């Protein structure tokens, strides 16, 4: 434990919180290119085939795994996508989401509710 004198000379510094989405480099979103599009299984107790893509971030070169939200998608290798932060709790290592309705990722077909989250225009 430091003495009062030591604390006067060098005060305590607050601990910096860890960056949850380091590959975005403090940007809200980044453009990326799909390297591999595949499905993976969640950890216990859940069971499904979750759609994910391994993407290479443009102008940065690092590869991360991003989740493809919604039912059905049109993504394949070399698709250009927009990624945002946000992890998927039951998929270890997936810390990014692909933004639907931006760049090559089309919006979810037939979506009626929560449309803004899935890139769907207001069908009149």
Swiss-Prot record:
The gene is rpsL. CDD domains: Ribosomal_S12 (cd03368). GO terms for molecular function: rRNA binding; structural constituent of ribosome; tRNA binding. Keywords: Methylation, Ribonucleoprotein, Ribosomal protein, RNA-binding, rRNA-binding, tRNA-binding. Residues 1-29 are annotated as: Disordered. GO terms for cellular component: small ribosomal subunit. The modification 3-methylthioaspartic acid is found at residue 90. HAMAP family: Ribosomal_uS12_B. GO terms for biological process: translation. This is Small ribosomal subunit protein uS12. Belongs to the universal ribosomal protein uS12 family. It comes from Anaplasma marginale (strain Florida).
């Amino acid at each position: 434990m430091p003495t009062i004198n030591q604390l006067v000379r060098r005060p305590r510094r607050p601990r910096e919180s860890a960056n949850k989405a380091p590959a975005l480099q403090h940007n809200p979103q980044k453009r990326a290119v799909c390297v591999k599009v595949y499905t993976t299984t969640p950890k216990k107790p859940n069971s499904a085939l979750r759609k994910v893509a391994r993407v290479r971030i443009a102008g940065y070169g690092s590869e991360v795994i991003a989740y493809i939200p919604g039912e059905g998608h049109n993504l394949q290798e070399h698709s250009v996508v927009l990624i945002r932060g946000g992890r998927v709790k039951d998929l270890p290592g997936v810390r990014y989401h692909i933004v639907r309705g931006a760049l090559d990722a089309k919006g979810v077909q037939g979506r009626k509710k929560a449309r803004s989250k899935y890139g769907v225009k207001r069908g009149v």
